[in-house]
Amino acid sequence: MSACLGFRELGLQPYEPVLEAMRRFTEQRSPDSQDEIWLVEHPAVFTQGQAGKAEHLLVPGDIPVVQTDRGGQVTYHGPGQQVAYLLLDVRRLGFGVRELVSRIEQALIGLLASYDVQASAKPDAPGVYVDGAKIASLGLRIRNGRSFHGLALNVDMDLAPFRRINPCGYAGLAMTQLRDLAGPIELDEVRTRLRGQLVKHLDYAEQTTLTGGID
């Protein structure tokens, strides 16, 4: 079991500065650096992963498109979606990539179960699904044994922009969100429950809230 996992709650932040901060953190961290998870919402943005194809951006319209270095294909971020960036020393944790993905999926499934929503993962399509509709997306990058990027959970948001793309490269993939499955949801409470599930499933002994910026 690892020691302490630090969380930063960043509120609503533009995507690109957070992306650059993740890269800097990953490049500059030492073998003794504490693992961190950054909890954030983004203004409307499409992000294209390394496997993304231009034809999966159907009608982006006025929503910006950002090319990223995470795994996966195109997805949408917007207010009311809880994003968590996992800045972990995966080598120190002793996880392979597949195990890390599975542990993140199990944390999300556990969170949803706490709202009486039964969800599952698919071995051939990372993420978490409810009755075939996707509620959470995953996209990671591992560099020198350290992870960055992470997960996006649809909580209480406008899902319409997902219709402008083929989410994760799948034409017609249905998307859902926690509000539509469990009624009115407080995002603060979702964050608290998500923190607990990530600490549990990533096998940390405790958690702490980190203060200060990410510049």
Curated annotation (Swiss-Prot):
Lowers pKa of active site Cys (site feature) positions: 134
Cytoplasm is among the record's keywords: yes
Subcellular location: Cytoplasm
Name of a matching Pfam family: LplA-B_cat
Binding residues annotated for substrate, in chain numbering: 70-77, 137-139, 150-152
Assigned EC number: 2.3.1.181
GO BP, sorted A to Z: protein modification process
InterPro entries per record: aa-tRNA-synth_II/BPL/LPL, BPL_LPL_catalytic, Octanoyltransferase, Octanoyltransferase_CS
Broad enzyme group: transferase
Record's keyword annotation contains Oxidoreductase: no
Gene Ontology CC terms: cytoplasm
Domain of life: Bacteria
NCBIfam families in the cross-refs: lipB (TIGR00214), PRK14342.1 (NF010922)
Function noted in UniProt: Catalyzes the transfer of endogenously produced octanoic acid from octanoyl-acyl-carrier-protein onto the lipoyl domains of lipoate-dependent enzymes. Lipoyl-ACP can also act as a substrate although octanoyl-ACP is likely to be the physiological substrate.
Further comment: In the reaction, the free carboxyl group of octanoic acid is attached via an amide linkage to the epsilon-amino group of a specific lysine residue of lipoyl domains of lipoate-dependent enzymes.
Protein name: Octanoyltransferase
Naturally occurring in which organism (per UniProt): Pseudomonas putida (strain GB-1)
Species lineage: Bacteria, Pseudomonadati, Pseudomonadota, Gammaproteobacteria, Pseudomonadales
Chain's gene name: lipB
